[in-house]
Amino acid sequence: MKKIAIDAMGGDHAPKAIVEGVNQAIEAFSDIEVQLYGDQSRIESYLVKSDRVSIVHTDEKINSDDEPAKAIRRKKNASMVLAARAVKDGRADAVLSAGNTGALLAAGLFIIGRIKGVDRPGLLSTLPTVDGSGFDMLDLGANAENTAEHLHQYAILGSFYAKHVRGIAKPRIGLLNNGTEATKGDSLRKEVYNFLASDSSLQFIGNVEARDLMSGVADVVVADGFTGNAVLKSIEGTAMSIMGQLKSAIAVGGVKAKFGALLLKSSLYDLKDTLDYSSAGGAVLFGLKAPLVKSHGSSDAKAIFHTIKQVRTMLETDVVGQLVEEFSKESDVND
Protein backbone atom coordinates (compact mmCIF):
# COMPACT_ATOMS: atom_id res chain seq x y z
CA MET A 1 0.00 0.00 0.00
CA LYS A 2 1.37 3.39 -1.02
CA LYS A 3 1.10 5.94 1.80
CA ILE A 4 0.78 9.61 0.82
CA ALA A 5 0.94 12.47 3.34
CA ILE A 6 -1.05 15.50 2.18
CA ASP A 7 -1.11 19.04 3.52
CA ALA A 8 -4.87 19.62 3.53
CA MET A 9 -4.57 23.31 4.43
CA GLY A 10 -2.26 24.47 1.63
CA GLY A 11 -3.57 26.28 -1.44
CA ASP A 12 -6.18 28.87 -2.39
CA HIS A 13 -9.10 26.44 -2.17
CA ALA A 14 -8.07 24.37 0.85
CA PRO A 15 -9.28 22.22 2.35
CA LYS A 16 -12.24 21.76 -0.02
CA ALA A 17 -10.32 21.16 -3.27
CA ILE A 18 -7.68 19.05 -1.53
CA VAL A 19 -10.18 16.74 0.16
CA GLU A 20 -12.41 16.42 -2.90
CA GLY A 21 -9.35 15.47 -4.96
CA VAL A 22 -8.49 12.86 -2.33
CA ASN A 23 -12.05 11.48 -2.51
CA GLN A 24 -11.64 10.99 -6.27
CA ALA A 25 -8.22 9.35 -5.88
CA ILE A 26 -9.35 6.94 -3.17
CA GLU A 27 -12.19 5.81 -5.43
CA ALA A 28 -9.89 5.43 -8.45
CA PHE A 29 -6.87 3.74 -6.84
CA SER A 30 -7.25 0.82 -4.43
CA ASP A 31 -3.54 0.69 -3.58
CA ILE A 32 -3.12 4.07 -1.86
CA GLU A 33 -3.61 5.31 1.69
CA VAL A 34 -3.86 9.03 2.40
CA GLN A 35 -2.96 10.91 5.57
CA LEU A 36 -4.58 14.36 5.67
CA TYR A 37 -2.91 16.96 7.89
CA GLY A 38 -4.97 19.95 9.01
CA ASP A 39 -8.14 21.13 10.71
CA GLN A 40 -10.09 17.93 11.36
CA SER A 41 -13.58 19.46 11.46
CA ARG A 42 -13.07 21.35 8.20
CA ILE A 43 -11.56 18.30 6.50
CA GLU A 44 -14.41 16.04 7.64
CA SER A 45 -17.01 18.39 6.15
CA TYR A 46 -15.77 17.46 2.65
CA LEU A 47 -14.39 13.96 3.18
CA VAL A 48 -16.09 10.81 1.99
CA LYS A 49 -15.23 8.41 4.79
CA SER A 50 -12.84 5.60 3.92
CA ASP A 51 -10.70 3.23 5.96
CA ARG A 52 -7.82 4.28 3.69
CA VAL A 53 -7.95 7.93 4.74
CA SER A 54 -6.80 9.18 8.14
CA ILE A 55 -6.75 12.70 9.56
CA VAL A 56 -3.99 14.17 11.72
CA HIS A 57 -5.44 17.26 13.37
CA THR A 58 -3.52 20.51 13.70
CA ASP A 59 -4.64 24.13 14.02
CA GLU A 60 -1.36 25.47 12.68
CA LYS A 61 -0.61 26.13 9.02
CA ILE A 62 1.94 27.97 6.91
CA ASN A 63 0.52 30.99 5.11
CA SER A 64 1.40 32.16 1.62
CA ASP A 65 3.20 35.25 2.96
CA ASP A 66 5.27 33.43 5.60
CA GLU A 67 9.04 33.52 5.17
CA PRO A 68 9.85 29.92 4.14
CA ALA A 69 12.83 28.92 6.30
CA LYS A 70 11.52 30.71 9.41
CA ALA A 71 8.08 29.17 8.99
CA ILE A 72 9.51 25.65 8.83
CA ARG A 73 11.59 26.23 11.97
CA ARG A 74 8.98 28.06 14.04
CA LYS A 75 5.72 26.41 12.99
CA LYS A 76 6.66 22.88 13.95
CA ASN A 77 3.03 21.75 14.10
CA ALA A 78 2.01 23.26 10.77
CA SER A 79 0.16 20.86 8.47
CA MET A 80 2.91 21.04 5.84
CA VAL A 81 5.68 20.39 8.38
CA LEU A 82 3.87 17.44 9.95
CA ALA A 83 3.26 15.90 6.51
CA ALA A 84 6.97 16.19 5.64
CA ARG A 85 7.92 14.82 9.05
CA ALA A 86 5.72 11.76 8.43
CA VAL A 87 7.86 10.97 5.38
CA LYS A 88 11.09 11.58 7.30
CA ASP A 89 9.95 9.22 10.08
CA GLY A 90 8.83 6.50 7.65
CA ARG A 91 5.09 6.80 8.35
CA ALA A 92 4.44 7.96 4.78
CA ASP A 93 6.15 7.37 1.43
CA ALA A 94 5.57 10.77 -0.21
CA VAL A 95 4.31 14.26 0.55
CA LEU A 96 2.03 16.58 -1.44
CA SER A 97 1.06 20.21 -0.82
CA ALA A 98 -0.50 23.11 -2.71
CA GLY A 99 0.80 25.56 -0.10
CA ASN A 100 3.68 28.03 0.15
CA THR A 101 6.22 26.88 -2.47
CA GLY A 102 9.31 28.20 -0.69
CA ALA A 103 8.27 26.63 2.59
CA LEU A 104 7.61 23.27 0.93
CA LEU A 105 11.02 23.34 -0.75
CA ALA A 106 12.60 24.19 2.61
CA ALA A 107 10.71 21.32 4.26
CA GLY A 108 11.97 19.00 1.57
CA LEU A 109 15.59 20.03 2.00
CA PHE A 110 15.69 20.39 5.80
CA ILE A 111 13.32 17.60 6.86
CA ILE A 112 13.35 14.93 4.12
CA GLY A 113 16.86 15.66 2.85
CA ARG A 114 18.83 15.33 -0.37
CA ILE A 115 19.98 12.09 -1.95
CA LYS A 116 23.71 11.65 -1.40
CA GLY A 117 25.48 12.92 -4.51
CA VAL A 118 22.74 15.35 -5.56
CA ASP A 119 24.10 18.88 -5.14
CA ARG A 120 20.84 20.79 -5.59
CA PRO A 121 17.49 19.10 -6.17
CA GLY A 122 15.63 20.72 -9.06
CA LEU A 123 11.97 21.67 -9.32
CA LEU A 124 10.61 19.68 -12.27
CA SER A 125 7.23 19.83 -13.97
CA THR A 126 5.70 18.32 -17.09
CA LEU A 127 4.53 21.18 -19.32
CA PRO A 128 2.20 21.10 -22.36
CA THR A 129 3.06 20.62 -26.02
CA VAL A 130 0.73 21.03 -28.99
CA ASP A 131 0.70 17.28 -29.65
CA GLY A 132 -0.26 16.52 -26.05
CA SER A 133 2.89 14.57 -25.20
CA GLY A 134 4.38 17.26 -22.94
CA PHE A 135 7.97 17.95 -21.90
CA ASP A 136 9.76 18.00 -18.56
CA MET A 137 11.54 21.16 -17.50
CA LEU A 138 13.85 21.92 -14.59
CA ASP A 139 14.83 23.92 -12.64
CA LEU A 140 11.60 25.90 -12.29
CA GLY A 141 12.71 28.04 -9.38
CA ALA A 142 14.10 25.93 -6.55
CA ASN A 143 17.48 27.61 -7.07
CA ALA A 144 17.79 31.17 -8.37
CA GLU A 145 21.51 30.84 -9.05
CA ASN A 146 23.21 27.82 -10.55
CA THR A 147 26.60 26.61 -11.71
CA ALA A 148 27.28 24.62 -14.86
CA GLU A 149 27.67 21.51 -12.70
CA HIS A 150 24.18 22.05 -11.29
CA LEU A 151 22.63 22.27 -14.76
CA HIS A 152 24.51 19.18 -15.89
CA GLN A 153 23.01 17.35 -12.92
CA TYR A 154 19.55 18.71 -13.78
CA ALA A 155 19.91 17.08 -17.19
CA ILE A 156 20.73 13.77 -15.51
CA LEU A 157 17.80 14.12 -13.09
CA GLY A 158 15.38 15.16 -15.84
CA SER A 159 16.43 12.30 -18.10
CA PHE A 160 16.00 9.84 -15.23
CA TYR A 161 12.49 11.13 -14.46
CA ALA A 162 11.42 11.06 -18.12
CA LYS A 163 12.63 7.47 -18.47
CA HIS A 164 11.21 6.00 -15.29
CA VAL A 165 8.04 8.02 -14.69
CA ARG A 166 6.97 9.00 -18.21
CA GLY A 167 8.29 5.89 -19.96
CA ILE A 168 10.46 7.64 -22.57
CA ALA A 169 13.26 5.23 -23.49
CA LYS A 170 15.75 7.84 -24.75
CA PRO A 171 14.70 11.32 -23.61
CA ARG A 172 15.95 14.15 -25.83
CA ILE A 173 17.71 16.73 -23.65
CA GLY A 174 17.70 20.39 -24.69
CA LEU A 175 19.48 23.33 -23.07
CA LEU A 176 17.34 26.48 -22.96
CA ASN A 177 19.27 29.26 -24.67
CA ASN A 178 18.84 32.40 -26.78
CA GLY A 179 19.69 30.55 -29.98
CA THR A 180 20.22 27.03 -31.26
CA GLU A 181 23.84 27.42 -32.37
CA ALA A 182 26.47 25.81 -30.14
CA THR A 183 28.25 29.16 -29.72
CA LYS A 184 25.15 30.97 -28.40
CA GLY A 185 24.56 32.13 -24.84
CA ASP A 186 26.50 33.53 -21.92
CA SER A 187 29.51 31.88 -20.29
CA LEU A 188 27.27 29.67 -18.09
CA ARG A 189 25.27 28.33 -21.03
CA LYS A 190 28.45 27.66 -23.05
CA GLU A 191 30.01 25.76 -20.17
CA VAL A 192 26.84 23.71 -19.64
CA TYR A 193 26.69 22.96 -23.37
CA ASN A 194 30.17 21.44 -23.22
CA PHE A 195 29.26 19.34 -20.18
CA LEU A 196 26.13 17.96 -21.83
CA ALA A 197 27.74 17.37 -25.21
CA SER A 198 30.50 15.31 -23.62
CA ASP A 199 28.17 13.17 -21.47
CA SER A 200 27.52 10.01 -23.52
CA SER A 201 24.80 8.85 -21.10
CA LEU A 202 22.54 11.70 -22.26
CA GLN A 203 20.83 12.14 -25.62
CA PHE A 204 21.71 15.82 -25.85
CA ILE A 205 20.19 17.54 -28.89
CA GLY A 206 21.77 20.96 -28.28
CA ASN A 207 20.36 24.38 -27.50
CA VAL A 208 16.63 25.02 -27.73
CA GLU A 209 14.75 28.32 -27.81
CA ALA A 210 11.76 29.22 -25.64
CA ARG A 211 9.53 29.72 -28.70
CA ASP A 212 9.95 26.05 -29.67
CA LEU A 213 9.25 24.44 -26.29
CA MET A 214 5.55 23.81 -26.83
CA SER A 215 6.19 22.28 -30.24
CA GLY A 216 7.86 19.33 -28.50
CA VAL A 217 11.42 20.05 -29.60
CA ALA A 218 12.78 18.19 -26.55
CA ASP A 219 11.56 15.74 -23.91
CA VAL A 220 13.57 17.42 -21.16
CA VAL A 221 14.57 21.08 -21.08
CA VAL A 222 17.30 22.27 -18.72
CA ALA A 223 17.48 25.81 -17.36
CA ASP A 224 18.75 27.69 -14.33
CA GLY A 225 16.05 28.28 -11.72
CA PHE A 226 15.58 31.98 -12.45
CA THR A 227 15.11 31.48 -16.19
CA GLY A 228 13.03 28.34 -15.78
CA ASN A 229 10.60 30.06 -13.43
CA ALA A 230 10.22 33.00 -15.83
CA VAL A 231 9.43 30.61 -18.71
CA LEU A 232 6.92 28.71 -16.55
CA LYS A 233 5.09 31.93 -15.66
CA SER A 234 5.10 32.96 -19.35
CA ILE A 235 3.51 29.66 -20.40
CA GLU A 236 0.89 29.98 -17.64
CA GLY A 237 0.13 33.58 -18.58
CA THR A 238 -0.09 32.84 -22.29
CA ALA A 239 -2.48 29.93 -21.73
CA MET A 240 -4.75 32.02 -19.50
CA SER A 241 -4.70 34.94 -21.94
CA ILE A 242 -5.62 32.77 -24.95
CA MET A 243 -8.55 31.14 -23.16
CA GLY A 244 -9.66 34.47 -21.74
CA GLN A 245 -9.62 36.15 -25.16
CA LEU A 246 -11.59 33.29 -26.71
CA LYS A 247 -14.27 33.49 -24.02
CA SER A 248 -14.45 37.28 -24.36
CA ALA A 249 -14.71 37.14 -28.16
CA ILE A 250 -17.51 34.58 -27.99
CA ALA A 251 -19.37 36.55 -25.30
CA VAL A 252 -19.41 39.84 -27.25
CA GLY A 253 -19.61 38.35 -30.73
CA GLY A 254 -23.35 37.90 -30.85
CA VAL A 255 -25.39 34.97 -32.11
CA LYS A 256 -23.02 34.04 -34.94
CA ALA A 257 -20.04 33.83 -32.58
CA LYS A 258 -21.96 31.69 -30.11
CA PHE A 259 -23.21 29.40 -32.88
CA GLY A 260 -19.66 29.09 -34.22
CA ALA A 261 -18.39 28.26 -30.74
CA LEU A 262 -21.06 25.58 -30.45
CA LEU A 263 -19.89 24.01 -33.72
CA LEU A 264 -16.27 24.18 -32.50
CA LYS A 265 -17.07 23.02 -28.98
CA SER A 266 -15.07 19.80 -29.24
CA SER A 267 -12.05 21.59 -30.76
CA LEU A 268 -12.18 24.31 -28.10
CA TYR A 269 -12.20 21.69 -25.35
CA ASP A 270 -9.21 20.01 -27.01
CA LEU A 271 -7.38 23.35 -27.01
CA LYS A 272 -8.23 23.89 -23.35
CA ASP A 273 -6.94 20.42 -22.47
CA THR A 274 -3.73 21.05 -24.43
CA LEU A 275 -3.01 24.29 -22.59
CA ASP A 276 -4.05 22.93 -19.18
CA TYR A 277 -1.08 21.05 -17.78
CA SER A 278 -2.74 20.35 -14.40
CA SER A 279 -3.61 16.88 -15.73
CA ALA A 280 0.13 16.11 -15.77
CA GLY A 281 0.31 16.63 -11.99
CA GLY A 282 2.42 18.97 -9.92
CA ALA A 283 6.03 20.08 -9.70
CA VAL A 284 8.46 17.57 -8.18
CA LEU A 285 11.46 18.62 -6.10
CA PHE A 286 13.52 15.87 -7.66
CA GLY A 287 16.68 14.72 -5.92
CA LEU A 288 15.22 14.27 -2.43
CA LYS A 289 15.14 10.99 -0.50
CA ALA A 290 11.38 10.69 -1.10
CA PRO A 291 8.83 12.11 -3.56
CA LEU A 292 7.80 15.68 -2.71
CA VAL A 293 5.27 17.23 -5.08
CA LYS A 294 3.96 20.80 -5.19
CA SER A 295 0.51 21.29 -6.68
CA HIS A 296 -0.38 24.75 -7.99
CA GLY A 297 -1.79 27.09 -5.35
CA SER A 298 -4.99 27.54 -7.37
CA SER A 299 -5.49 23.79 -7.85
CA ASP A 300 -9.04 22.46 -7.97
CA ALA A 301 -10.10 18.91 -7.10
CA LYS A 302 -9.22 17.67 -10.60
CA ALA A 303 -5.66 19.00 -10.33
CA ILE A 304 -5.21 17.44 -6.89
CA PHE A 305 -6.48 14.10 -8.21
CA HIS A 306 -3.94 14.17 -11.05
CA THR A 307 -1.15 15.14 -8.66
CA ILE A 308 -2.00 12.17 -6.43
CA LYS A 309 -1.99 10.00 -9.56
CA GLN A 310 1.49 11.36 -10.38
CA VAL A 311 2.75 10.59 -6.85
CA ARG A 312 1.31 7.09 -7.12
CA THR A 313 3.22 6.55 -10.38
CA MET A 314 6.44 7.76 -8.77
CA LEU A 315 5.96 5.29 -5.93
CA GLU A 316 4.91 2.49 -8.27
CA THR A 317 8.05 2.89 -10.40
CA ASP A 318 10.25 3.47 -7.32
CA VAL A 319 11.92 6.27 -9.24
CA VAL A 320 13.50 7.74 -6.09
CA GLY A 321 14.87 4.38 -4.97
CA GLN A 322 16.37 3.83 -8.41
CA LEU A 323 17.81 7.35 -8.37
CA VAL A 324 19.47 6.68 -5.00
CA GLU A 325 21.00 3.52 -6.46
CA GLU A 326 22.19 5.39 -9.57
CA PHE A 327 23.93 8.12 -7.57
CA SER A 328 25.39 5.51 -5.22
CA LYS A 329 27.04 3.81 -8.22
CA GLU A 330 28.34 7.17 -9.44
CA SER A 331 29.74 7.91 -5.97
CA ASP A 332 31.51 4.53 -5.88
CA VAL A 333 33.09 5.20 -9.29
CA ASN A 334 34.28 8.65 -8.21
CA ASP A 335 35.70 7.24 -4.97
From Swiss-Prot:
* This protein's record includes keyword Iron: no
Which segments of the protein form a coiled coil according to its record?
Answer: none
SUPFAM superfamilies reported for this sequence: Isocitrate/Isopropylmalate dehydrogenase-like
Q: What cellular-component terms does GO give this entry?
A: cytoplasm
**Oligomer status and interactors:** Homodimer. Probably interacts with PlsY.
Q: Which family does it belong to?
A: Belongs to the PlsX family.
Question: Which source organism?
Answer: Streptococcus equi subsp. zooepidemicus (strain MGCS10565)
Q: Which BP terms from GO are recorded?
A: fatty acid biosynthetic process; phospholipid biosynthetic process
Transmembrane region(s) = none
UniProt keywords (A-Z) are: Cytoplasm, Lipid biosynthesis, Lipid metabolism, Phospholipid biosynthesis, Phospholipid metabolism, Transferase
InterPro entries linked to this entry: FA_synthesis (IPR003664), Phospholipid_synth_PlsX-like (IPR012281)
UniProt-annotated location(s): Cytoplasm
Q: What is its biological role?
A: Catalyzes the reversible formation of acyl-phosphate (acyl-PO(4)) from acyl-[acyl-carrier-protein] (acyl-ACP). This enzyme utilizes acyl-ACP as fatty acyl donor, but not acyl-CoA.
Xref: HAMAP family: PlsX (MF_00019)
One molecular function GO term is: phosphate:acyl-[acyl carrier protein] acyltransferase activity
**Pfam families hit by this protein:** FA_synthesis (PF02504)
What's the protein called, per UniProt?
Phosphate acyltransferase
State the EC number(s).
2.3.1.274
Q: Which domain of life does this protein belong to?
A: Bacteria
Kindly indicate whether the keyword Transmembrane belongs to this entry: no
The record's catalysed reaction(s) read:
a fatty acyl-[ACP] + phosphate = an acyl phosphate + holo-[ACP]
